[in-house]
Amino acid sequence: FDKYKVEVLEKSVRPPRYVGDVYGKGDEGKEALMDLKFTQDAQGQLWVWSLPEIWEDEKVTSRYLTVVDVGGRSNKADWSVIVVFDRYWMMEGDKPCVVAQWYGHIDIDLLAWKAAQIAKFYDNSLLVIESNTLETHDKERDTEGDQSGFILNQIRSVYKHLYARKQSAEDIKKKAPKKYGFH
């Protein structure tokens, strides 16, 4: 990265308002998305600058966007990162802003469920999971084969706001299954 551009960006960095995590009744499956709540914990992996704003008298559709960069589970691997963007001010011509960020080392299937919990907590936001890592066959990445279809379809069965790639006319004609995740 250009160090001068990084220095400019650093001036707008501020500490999170809250640190903790989002929890449901379970860690995976339907229960993971039930009774979600944010719990403050100084050791938590979710940094929150703004909790979700959901108004009863007004609905802002597609306000939040949750994006996942899949890392690895070992300490030597890249960090996995889940970022939530608030796109509300884009209606006024402004830029989206980061309202929450989770980072850590975690098994890929649990990362996907954690991302679904955070996305649901942020008003059922669109969940975009980077699938390059999930679909790679690079032995250095420690993905243990191609689990992407299984993991993303498992999430899709309980969380309907999962990003799917645009299908070609040929795939539609063949009735090929949707490919979830950003590649």
Spell out what each predicted region is:
Residues 179-183:
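Conserved motor-coupling elements within RecA-like helicase/translocase cores
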Residues 172-176:
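Domain-level recognition of nuclease-like catalytic cores that cleave nucleotide substrates
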Residues 1-171:
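RNase H-like, metal-dependent nuclease domains and their acidic two-metal-ion catalytic environment used
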